[in-house]
Swiss-Prot record:
Keyword match Hydrolase: yes
CDD domains hit by this protein: IMPCH (cd01421)
PANTHER family: BIFUNCTIONAL PURINE BIOSYNTHESIS PROTEIN ATIC, BIFUNCTIONAL PURINE BIOSYNTHESIS PROTEIN PURH
Taxonomic classification: Bacteria, Pseudomonadati, Pseudomonadota, Alphaproteobacteria, Hyphomicrobiales
Species this chain originates from: Brucella abortus (strain 2308)
Name of the protein in question: Bifunctional purine biosynthesis protein PurH
PROSITE patterns reported for this sequence: MGS
MGS-like domain span: 6-158
Homology family: Belongs to the PurH family.
EC number: 2.1.2.3, 3.5.4.10
Pathway note: Purine metabolism; IMP biosynthesis via de novo pathway; 5-formamido-1-(5-phospho-D-ribosyl)imidazole-4-carboxamide from 5-amino-1-(5-phospho-D-ribosyl)imidazole-4-carboxamide (10-formyl THF route): step 1/1; Purine metabolism; IMP biosynthesis via de novo pathway; IMP from 5-formamido-1-(5-phospho-D-ribosyl)imidazole-4-carboxamide: step 1/1
InterPro entries: AICAR_Tfase_dup_dom_sf, Cytidine_deaminase-like, MGS-like_dom, MGS-like_dom_sf, PurH-like
Amino acid sequence: MAVSSKHIPAPDLHRVRRALLSVSDKTGLIDFAKALHANGVEILSTGGTAKSIAAAGIPVKDVSEITGFPEIMDGRVKTLHPAVHGGLLAVRNDPEHVAAMEEHGIGGIDLAVINLYPFEEVRFKGGDYDTTVENIDIGGPAMIRASAKNHAYVATVVDPADYADVVAELEKHSGSLPLAFRKKLAAKAFSRTAAYDAAISNWFAEAIDEETPTYRAAAGKLHSVMRYGENPHQTAGFYLTGEKRPGVATATQLQGKQLSYNNINDTDAAFELVAEFDPARTAAVAIIKHANPCGVAEASTIKEAYLKALACDPVSAFGGIVALNRTLDEEAAEEIVKTFTEVIIAPDATEGAQAIVAAKKNLRLLVTGGLPDPRAKGIAAKTVAGGLLVQSRDNGVVDDLDLKVVTKRAPTEAELNDLKFAFRVGKHVKSNAIVYVKDGATVGIGAGQMSRVDSARIAARKAEDAAEAAGLAAPLTKGCVVASDAFFPFADGLLSAVEAGATAVIQPGGSMRDDEVIAAADEHGIAMVMTGMRHFRH
């Protein structure tokens, strides 16, 4: 049953006479405590926070002095006491609450400055189970929630970035804080505890291999506010979850304008794709537009891989994202800057390459320090009206699959290498996806069509256009291989690929008409490999 309210109006300005400071992150703590003391605020504190404040010569009272109870159980129990929570939760102009405070000797607390044990940091650094559990804060969230609920009389500060604003408001209002400001702090406080609990619940689900927990929480911390979202009439913000997976969220931006919503989405897609290629084996480049690849290639150098990728669809590459699986060097940088590019993302960049890119001041250059592991577990989520779709990350890798040759002719070694390449790329193309590959480079990509045969035709037409632009008589698809992200429901998609010049095919299989498709391949002397794994992408 819901708890009813007494409807006691909150004061607009509430005087801050007493503050409780208990922080794990001590950034800015001493200057803030000095400012509170200068504004006549009595400071209560706990453990290490109290020691730091006292060491700076600022008067401070340990919370055990008001509870009459020492910290026990390795600090697990120190603020879970009525003298603390009564001071945070009391409604100051409710006679019953005031009487209870007087009867039990509870003093009001007007400002709660709390930040939490670094659970998220320990979690993502790979702390062992017991260490991670020990970093689950109990008293901190309890105090934050208590003070934020009672924002009519208590201001709650959970972020050192807000210290300056608190001091400014205190000085502006002669030692008081306005209700609107207290509400703003309370909203932030509840979002902080929600994010903290989300991190804990998600970690526990992973720890016990619970893939579909009864409750699923998602949370992140605001990193930046976008100028707009996918379109100018949409608002947007970029939130970080704390996951250390190398990519756009963890990258260092060395130069260029602020990343837009679409930049971030496309850059993530590009870097996840290029990470499919082991840098110890080959250099690889992916060029992305609207989260779909325009061209992907591998070679002995990044420069060569870039030029091969660009040749696939140089028109669409204009204004695209370029992702590398190796360090950006001077030779590659000189080629990339010849075409208008929004973002370059790479594990690293040489000083010479950075100097070349610097000539294009708006070009964003990101370095990540590494590549994401395509085999790593993770989750992918999508919102729908009234719900959240959550699934495991598509971490299937073609090198790990049991490939089956289903035609009379087996692919040659060169064809098989290109087939695997094409299937890696197809995993990152919006469905229905058809990818033509020759000599370690895409030569035609068909994406996002409602019918597979249309994707095959579009990819072939793009290959013809690219050949014409390069002054070649034959289409780039002549003698190529083709990958499909899902099975061919009919032979028509395969026949379109054959017509384009493909000599070998890789696809998941699983259609009720597989025999018909295989027969068509045999009739045309095509080698076909089935993977048993589909890569739909929507």
